[in-house]
């Protein structure tokens, strides 16, 4: 945001910055350092182009002449443009030849800024600009800010290293930038508020400013999208007023579509007209961008599309009906289903579900859409076939609505008997697979196992998806009983089947089981590497598998937390929680729990318990049975109470919850918390020891330790050794305390389990120093190295000054893979630049 002012040491009127301007060195420094003759800032309205150009102008060297020509986006004729340019330069003549000669003969360094170049197609003016930019005077630098990319010979400039370009995405604010602007927000709320503003604005500069002027309603933590009259007014003036009525209508229709391409536009707006409308909107910088980095699909910039969808009447059901017809003709069943729902053609939507499989549940927000359709239309519409019953049942189980799922499963009886005995057995086997998962999630292990095994015995090759689900359920049960060998064998069988069917979604689901196995065995780094790889593969999918990516992010957050990487864990928990909330996944619980644990690590127990209350509130709002969340919620709460010195609260809660997992009607722990029962038991021993209300605490802990050691559960073993140390210290056995501590520390070092040690320190801040171990725990011996072996190779080559291409050639991997490794390195080390990554790695001692 700029205004004009007279500057005595520069020719003419020059811009000045807004009092609210935020200087961003990461954008300015590369622009000023670039030796390219032409700097092009091409981005939609409100992207901060003028402000960035102004900052660069104000930093021009003292021996440099700087000229500022504000064009206001007007569609000027060539003669008028030449006149204005000549006037700015102080030339007496404005004919083209004089301009070209004068610029070519400049003898002093000159920076010429063209701000807000012509917004509408103007081929004649673009050709003149191309001739001006072709002047090869090394003393002349062009700085061009524009919404529309002019039709100039950019490839030639690029090949000659004479072009430096900034696009809209690079101009966006990041969370740190926004935190600096939140001067009216309490510091403790700044990070969360900045994150919410980013989510709603995409970092778009005008959107961020409007959010700040609207008063940031997100400070209260509400996720509701507020209508912004200011944003709509801005769009009217800066976008719609520059377009024809036909283009305005087309843009508003497209804003209501999740994705579109030229062919769909032809269907919607007429043959020969639709593709032209789309091209014009793209050419004029109307916030049209690639849909999730796709080469084939486009979308309207999400924050603006969301604002338009909130406005009633800007697009009718008829447009969605026509879009549904096009997607159906293209056999794009996902797009057709979404458009049928938006058109409120519910019977059509149900008929399209015949083309859906279980894999569709892990795409986008299909679970939410299916559940809404089921609730809105009732059983008559959505339970018309065994396949529909299976889809709705799976969606209900995914969301944690077990009672409704049980009712839904019972509907399978309506489709019996089948015409043949074989079909009857297949239908029964599918029922058993679904019933097995319901029982498994309810904690009824034996009954679930029987159903899984009987279903596997009957399910045919065409029912491979149901077979995979049974194998996954059996894998999780093996993990819950600490039978790691059986779990590994079952998981391998399932992965082989998923790969044979070419199902990357199922492979990702099964790799989550594999990662749990690795975590249980004390190999969090291998688990993280496994999940990072599958995450990368899934992100290349055309339809974003949001629910699966959410679960993977939460598991990676847990792994990062266990290794002492709180910053990375926080990012994973945030992204995973966002995806799980969006897709109605009951696993959103673990996003809240993870955030609570990160807060407790920072001694912010008020925030930690707030996140636990948020978790409980969500579970209750969604009517999820308390067997899903009560045990782990109280276990984490008890961790915090013990750290606060409140063992009585911990003892009461743990005693109560342990009853559910002991006795004749005992339930298994939820599949996402494999070692929940053992953790509850050792925390209860700790609480009772502090209260001096325990008998034989060390014997009880040693029994748990023996079980963990026998089954290779190294992560749990480390926690138990540290718990034995604490209890031995409290009961006056220093020798045992010291030996248990040393055994625990060895596991912490070997398996990178820094969180277990952090929790001991939070419970007993002076214990390590009293036992003489604090001095030995230097950062070099305990600091977690989050990088995989391949990432260390890449970082070492970066430290040697190699380019990405050179690294790819030396390691025999693709350039894309090198860039992916570099992004992961930056994320894990919490840095933005290569030099920062190298410096931090050297400080950690992982790179020489």
Language model features with spans:
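P-loop NTPase Walker A phosphate-binding motif
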Residues: 39-66
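Amphipathic alpha-helical "lid/sensor" segments that cap RecA-like P-loop NTPase cores
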Residues: 53, 149, 165, 183-233, ...
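C-terminal boundary/linker of central alpha/beta nucleotide-binding cores
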Residues: 54, 147-148, 232-310, 318
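Conserved P-loop NTPase "ATPase switch" module shared by AAA+ and STAND
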Residues: 103-125
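A structural signal for repeat-array scaffolds
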Residues: 242, 289-387, 399, 408-411, ...
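Alpha-solenoid helical repeat architecture
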Residues: 294, 332, 345-350, 384-389, ...
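Amphipathic alpha-helical segments of tetratricopeptide repeats
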Residues: 337, 357-358, 375-378, 410-420, ...
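Recognition helix of helix-turn-helix DNA-binding domains
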Residues: 801-836, 840
């Amino acid at each position: 945001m700029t205004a004009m002012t007279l500057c005595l040491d520069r020719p003419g009127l020059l811009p000045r910055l807004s009092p609210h301007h935020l200087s961003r060195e990461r954008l300015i420094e590369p622009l000023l350092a670039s030796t390219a003759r032409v700097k092009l800032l091409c981005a939609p309205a409100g992207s901060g182009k003028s402000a960035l150009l102004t900052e660069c102008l104000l930093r021009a060297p003292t021996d440099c002449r700087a000229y500022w020509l504000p064009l206001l986006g007007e569609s000027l004729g060539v003669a008028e443009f030449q006149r204005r340019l000549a006037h700015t330069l102080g030339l007496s003549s404005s004919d083209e030849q004089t301009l070209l000669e004068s610029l070519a003969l400049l003898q002093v360094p000159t920076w010429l800024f063209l701000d807000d170049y012509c917004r509408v197609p103007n081929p004649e003016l673009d050709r003149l600009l191309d001739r001006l930019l072709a002047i090869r005077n090394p003393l002349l630098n062009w700085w061009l800010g524009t919404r529309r990319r002019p039709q100039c010979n950019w490839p030639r400039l690029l090949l000659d290293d004479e072009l430096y370009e900034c696009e809209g995405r690079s101009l966006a604010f990041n969370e740190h930038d926004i935190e600096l602007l939140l001067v009216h927000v309490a510091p403790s709320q700044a990070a969360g508020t900045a994150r919410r503003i980013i989510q709603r604005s995409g970092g778009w500069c005008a959107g961020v400013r409007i959010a700040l002027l609207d008063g940031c309603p997100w400070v209260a933590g509400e996720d509701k999208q507020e209508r912004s009259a200011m944003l709509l007014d801005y769009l009217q003036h800066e976008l719609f007023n520059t377009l024809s009525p036909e283009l305005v209508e087309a843009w508003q229709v497209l804003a209501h579509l999740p994705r579109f391409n030229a062919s769909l536009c032809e269907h919607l707006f007429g043959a020969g007209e639709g593709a032209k409308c789309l091209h014009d909107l793209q050419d004029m910088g109307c916030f049209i961008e690639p849909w999730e980095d796709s080469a084939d699909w486009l979308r309207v910039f999400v924050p603006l599309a969301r604002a338009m969808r909130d406005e009633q009447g800007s697009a009718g059901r008829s447009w969605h009906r026509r879009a549904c017809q096009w997607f159906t003709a293209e056999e794009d069943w996902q797009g057709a289903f979404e458009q049928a729902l938006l058109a409120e053609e519910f019977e059509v939507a149900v008929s399209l579900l015949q083309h859906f499989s279980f894999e569709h549940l892990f795409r986008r927000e299909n679970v939410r859409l299916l559940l809404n359709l089921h609730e809105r239309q009732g059983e008559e519409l959505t339970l018309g076939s065994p396949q529909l019953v299976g889809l709705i049942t799976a969606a209900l189980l995914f969301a944690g609505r077990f009672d409704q799922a049980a009712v839904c499963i019972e509907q399978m009886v309506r489709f019996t008997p089948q015409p043949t005995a074989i079909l009857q057995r297949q239908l029964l086997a599918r029922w058993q697979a679904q019933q097995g998962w319901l029982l498994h999630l309810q904690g009824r292990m034996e009954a679930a196992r029987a159903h899984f095994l009987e279903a596997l015995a009957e399910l045919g090759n065409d029912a491979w998806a149901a077979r995979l689900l049974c194998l996954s359920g059996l894998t999780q049960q093996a993990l819950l009983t600490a039978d790691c060998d059986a779990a590994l064998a079952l998981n391998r069988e399932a992965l082989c089947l998923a790969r044979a069917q070419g199902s990357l979604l199922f492979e990702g689901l099964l790799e989550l089981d594999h990662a749990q196995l690795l975590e249980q065995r004390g190999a969090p780094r291998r688990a993280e590497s496994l999940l990072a790889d599958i995450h990368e593969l899934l992100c290349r999918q055309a339809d974003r598998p949001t629910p699966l990516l959410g679960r993977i992010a939460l598991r990676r957050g847990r792994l990062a937390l266990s290794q002492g990487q709180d910053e990375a864990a926080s990012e994973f928990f945030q992204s995973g929680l966002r995806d799980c909330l969006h897709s109605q996944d009951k696993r959103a619980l673990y996003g809240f729990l993870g955030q609570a644990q990160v807060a407790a690590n920072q001694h912010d127990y008020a925030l930690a318990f707030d996140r636990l209350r948020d978790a409980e509130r969500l579970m209750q709002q969604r009517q999820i049975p308390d067997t899903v969340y009560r045990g782990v919620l109280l276990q984490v709460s008890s961790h915090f109470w013990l750290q606060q010195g409140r063992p009585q609260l911990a003892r009461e809660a743990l005693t109560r919850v342990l009853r559910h997992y002991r006795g004749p009607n005992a339930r298994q722990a939820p599949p996402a918390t494999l070692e929940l029962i053992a953790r509850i038991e050792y925390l209860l021993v700790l609480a009772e020891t502090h209260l001096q209300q325990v008998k034989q605490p060390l014997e009880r802990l040693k029994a748990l330790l023996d079980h963990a050691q026998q089954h290779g559960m190294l992560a749990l073993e480390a926690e138990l050794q540290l718990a034995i140390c604490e209890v031995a210290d409290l009961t006056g056995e220093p020798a045992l305390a010291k030996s248990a501590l040393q055994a625990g520390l060895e596991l912490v070092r070997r398996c990178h389990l820094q969180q277990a040690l952090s929790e001991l320190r939070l419970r007993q801040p002076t214990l390590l120093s009293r036992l003489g171990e604090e001095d030995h725990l230097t950062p070099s011996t305990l600091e977690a190295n989050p990088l995989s072996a391949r990432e260390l190779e890449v970082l070492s080559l970066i430290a040697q000054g190699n380019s990405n291409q050179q690294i790819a050639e030396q390691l025999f991997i693709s350039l894309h893979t090198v860039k992916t490794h570099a992004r992961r390195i930056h994320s894990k080390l919490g840095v933005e630049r290569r030099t920062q990554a190298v410096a931090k790695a050297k400080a950690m001692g992982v790179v020489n």
